[in-house]
Amino acid sequence: MSSEYAKLVASLSNQDILTKWPEVTPLKKISGIPRSAGSDSSDSDLFDGHDEEQIRLMEELCIVLDYDDKPVGAGTKKLCHIMDNINAGLLHRAFSVFLFNEDGKLLLQQRADEKITFANMWTNTCCSHPLCVPSELGVDSSLEGSKDVNNLTNAVKGAKVAAQRKLEHELGIPFEDAPIENFTYLTRIHYKSPSGDESSKWGEHEIDYILILKTKNDITVNANYNEVRDFKYVSADELKVMFEDDSLVFTPWFKLICQSFLFKWWDNLDNLDQFKDEEIHRLL
């Protein structure tokens, strides 16, 4: 049975979302706008004590969605991650990369202390957001009147483009070590979580595209320490030991994915097709 929160999100029409959040730029008006909004000094108390580069990145434009993962428009990363907006039903698109080397070990990262949300937490290889631009929506031209943005194949294509970009940005993994054609899309996860305790001003509410990437052992990793505090390759057994260590904190989406899916995928890295689906798994 759907949670009350899921029912709230499902009840919001495209027009409801645009009315409730007038800061969201409708999809038909997006062509030609920059990849990020201009500097916004409102709610400056939200950023007190935070890193300037991470504040700048909060103006990137995420893909605002309806309950069925259909793009509605562009909203800043800040808008999409304010907990009051999340509690009112604002939803956006994300992706999570799980990179495995030839030995079947998973590359984990610990998020940097500078991060505004989920700082210092261990998580999967890379988790971020496609930008609300044609290439990361999976279409090649103007968005005005385009129905192509509602096509799952195109959305997956856009998520892979974004994943390649962010692997380079966060971990210094060059494009040639993470070619688009090597990403395997499996499914989508819908979840919500505050960043920290329930009193947090920040959080996540995403439909998360799961991407598996199998690479050689000798790929280049050159971490951007404004994004990543630490990284390591682990076996499944080593990850389970990490989960037993109370001194380590993990992102909520990573824990949810591990509890429901990851270890089944890990046991079948050479036979992932059996896990592919077009569902949105609601973990709300």
Curated annotation (Swiss-Prot):
GO molecular function, one term: isopentenyl-diphosphate delta-isomerase activity
Protein's recorded name: Isopentenyl-diphosphate delta-isomerase
Taxonomic lineage from the root: Eukaryota, Fungi, Dikarya, Ascomycota, Saccharomycotina
Cofactor: Mg(2+)
Record-listed E.C. numbers: 5.3.3.2
Spans through the membrane: none
Pfam families (UniProt xref): NUDIX (PF00293)
Keyword Disulfide bond attached: no
NCBIfam families, per database record: IPP_isom_1
